[in-house]
Amino acid sequence: MHISNKTGLAIDATFSSSFGKSGLGIDVAHIGLKSNNLGTRKRQQFLLFVEHQFWFYNHQISVTPGIAVNYFNDFGWHNFPGMDVGLEIVPNLRIYGNLGYTYRVPTFTDLFYQDRTTIGNKNLEPETGFTKEIGVQMTRGKFIVNLAAFDRQASNLIDYVKEKETDLWQANNIALLNTFGLEGLVKTDYRIFQKQHRIEIAYTYLKDELGQSTLPFSRYAINSLKHHFIIKQFIEWGAQFTTGFVLKHAERTQGNPYQVLDLSLDWRFGKWTFRGQINNLLSTRYSETNLVPMPLANGLLTVGYDF
């Protein structure tokens, strides 16, 4: 059994001036976990990000440099800069590009999970990466189309590996990973029976090239994501209520596609927002990259307040 909790505070602010628009954000969180498998764990996190958007040639060109600084009590301080560039070719047609560094700390599952086939590794190091992306966006009223291609180079990849077929799978930082991807997104708003609807359709294709490893058996190599298709539908039933569903179809290297359905209900009351979610409504049995089974049907209730 797992009991997890997260307590946090997030503050975001934007400032506009004759020099452009600045953004600042702070996120502080405490994460706690009690598990009969992972043990009792705690993690403190602090995130600070700063960015500034410059406009040139009558807002036809935008350049947005930024940096994020992250602290985890068990992994220390790290920073990862990035930059976005956009160019409006003609009205409603824009090309963009971005590049930046990414950073992912090991999860409690990566560090401490144990079962009859798998063990974690408390000595794992964070994954790091560098991503480059170029894309184009077309807007016509409420109809938006976005197409993009990206390349990601990751190091210290966390993978589950073993030397012999009879060994247990163990988490290790073992390889470099180069990923090429294509993304497409179509979304629009429309009305049916005086109710506001919003639909989003997205598709992602990924091609991974795993660096040479001295270990012959790799979970990532046999279970990396290849195709990911998502449909999102939201309906506003008035000023206060919104319902939504998300249907996800995924196919991995091992060739076992699966579908996951999530439902949500939002109720807005003044500055308060209450959200109820049912994830994996159909209790689909599936695993993510690390082959650890994901939860069956489960619920989440969140409360938010706007200052």
Each language-model region and where it sits:
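Transmembrane beta-strands of outer-membrane beta-barrel proteins
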Residues: 20-26, 61-65, 95-97, 145-147, ...
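Outer-membrane beta-barrel signature, preferentially recognizing the C-terminal barrel domain
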Residues: 2, 101-155, 162-191, 222-227, ...
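Face-selective signature of the C-terminal outer-membrane beta-barrel domain
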Residues: 1-78, 82, 86-88, 146, ...
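Conserved C-terminal beta-signal and adjacent last beta-strands/turns
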Residues: 97, 217-307
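Gram-negative outer-membrane beta-barrel transporters
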Residues: 19-23, 56-60, 151-153, 173-251, ...
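Residues on the lipid-exposed face of transmembrane beta-strands in outer-membrane beta-barrel proteins
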Residues: 9-15, 48-54, 83-87, 134-138, ...
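Transmembrane beta-strands of outer-membrane beta-barrel pores
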Residues: 17-19, 28-34, 67-73, 99-105, ...
